[in-house]
Amino acid sequence: MNTLLQNLRYGLRMLAKSPGFSAVAILTLALGIGANAAIFQLIDAVRLRTLPVNDPSTLAIVHIDTKNWGSGNFNGPYSEFTFPLWQQVEQRQQAFSSIAAWGADRDNLATGGEVDMAHVLYASGDFFRTLGVSPFLGRLISAADDQNGCAGGVDLSYSFWQRRYGGTASAIGKTITLEGHPFPILGVTPPSFYGVSVGDRFDIAIPVCAEPIIHQGQFSFITGDRPRESWWLSVFGRLKPGWNLQRATAQLGTIMPAALHETIPPQYDAEGVKHYLAFTLETRPAANGFSSMRDDASDPLWLLLGLSGLVLLIACANLANLLLARASSREREIAVRLALGASRGRLIGQLLSESALLAVAGAVCGGFLAAVLSHSLVAFISTPGNPVFLDMPTDWRVLGFAGGLAILTTILFGLAPALRSGNIPPGAVLKTGGRGSTGGHERFRLQRILVASQVALSLVLLASALLFVRSLRNLMTRDPGFQENGILVANVDFTRLKVPDAQQELFTRNLLDRIRAIPGVATAATSNRSPVNGSSSNDWVLDDKGGHPNGASWEDYISPGYFETIENAKLMGRDFNSTDSANAPKVAIVNQTFVKKFLNGAKDSIGMRFRVWAPPGQQPRYYNIVGEVKDSVYNDMH
């Protein structure tokens, strides 16, 4: 231990004598280690971190495999549950000691005269019990709160409690108002619990039974027009002792046919019922929570970690070269110490201690840099309409990763120069006057290897950068099919206000008239979804014979003047106008891709018509094509 302390003190003195070299070395390592630690922190938050709950390894996600068939309100290989189907599964399952469901939404919140949007977690009665989460203050929602009539209250997340109530215990028992309905505050969740969805966090947890109170009438997922077609609940459970995922999936498979028969949507036709009854239940681990971000972000994050690792290797090769050059100027000092009886092992240890000090300093600075970079990356991908939250504490995993990088970098850039300097022949060096000529061939060969390594790694990075630049250039220069500049987007959500359709139309017309009257505004229009906003809606286009789906088509509901506003080129036909009312024949404007896909590439699509899916008992939905426009991007820029 004394020898180690002496080596470290000696290393500090030598580094202090060369402040310029030390600063450059520490900065180089800080950038390399910081970039790697930042990416690792993101990977840890998205893929590796387990939920802060009791025994997360025994939790399992229950999801529906829809066999890649979709219609109406569900689509894709994995689907959430409707409320009636969730009730059936909850009552019939025997694989879990406890099972729970949850949904998420953004609702209007009023507290103390302030009104804004809150992230609301709709939790079934056993949600917190299944997770094993205990309250930080007060009590959490229980099965007694999630009953018909829903007389229970709400729980606040710790962060929301701190923001809105300053962390005061007097918040318990107070009332908050969601969508105009008062609810008492029951408790506060622990500081480490942000929910079960990676990338999101909730503000308020409320029983599932309160959903019809919040979203009244036809808008409710439980008591609205189509509760059996509203897929909004995610389900998870805690496996019984001795049960595994395979056994749980097998047991759920035995109850699914009966559960599906009890919940067939009455609007489905024979084809829809056939596919609905073919659904199966699957299970997968829930220790890391629910996440759509995990599948989307994992590959890019691993790629970024690999590229940042190359940057660190280049930095280590560069520092090794600097240390070799620095060691050549100290050959006489080292030769004298060897001649006086100093052991080579002690000298190598002292030289390695300098490298270790540089690596530790670089790791410490890199840790601070990593915290800034990781949070900056999250802020970069987050938008006001789709905020992203990741729990990224600087815990033992991140510190261990940074410490491991410090050890690795010490070996990579410090070991070879230390071994080379510790093995110089003192007699030959002293005879030449210590001018650094001894062992020059070996030193230069090592330096050439390091330089070649730097060049090779730099070429790999350069090639990767060029590919990224080309992809970015393609995205930047791609014609989106509409004007990107000079367009202002504002959102109005009538569903939250429970405004009748007639009043919505009147309000919208008056609003557009006022906007068009503003000096500098050329035109204005409305649409359900603005271009490239990350959301989309589709409907099934059917053939005219058997009514079988030809495929899904993206759709949007727009006002007259929309294509003029976004400057999407009209190829033929006309725009919508005031005569295209709800009582008039249904009309549509299609794009080039629609014509190719569903109309066999017709040269003139004007006057043609197509049919979309309609529930049994309703009139067939036929649309006459009155216009055709140029293709444009809608969901994203890909």
Mark where each language-model region is.
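Alpha-helical transmembrane segments of integral membrane proteins
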Residues: 1-22, 289-293, 322-349, 353, ...
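Histidine-centered acyl-transfer/condensation active-site motif
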Residues: 310-320
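Short, strongly hydrophobic transmembrane alpha-helices
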Residues: 18-46, 50, 316, 359-363, ...
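Active-site alpha-helix of zinc metalloproteases
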Residues: 154, 314, 350, 358, ...
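Nucleotide-cofactor and metal-assisted catalytic machinery
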Residues: 22-24, 34-290, 375-400, 467-638
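N-terminal membrane-entry
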Residues: 293-309, 397-401
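Transmembrane alpha-helix boundary/hinge residues in polytopic small-molecule transporters
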Residues: 42, 319, 368, 372, ...
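Glycine-rich segments within core transmembrane alpha-helices of 12-TM secondary carriers
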Residues: 362-366, 370, 410
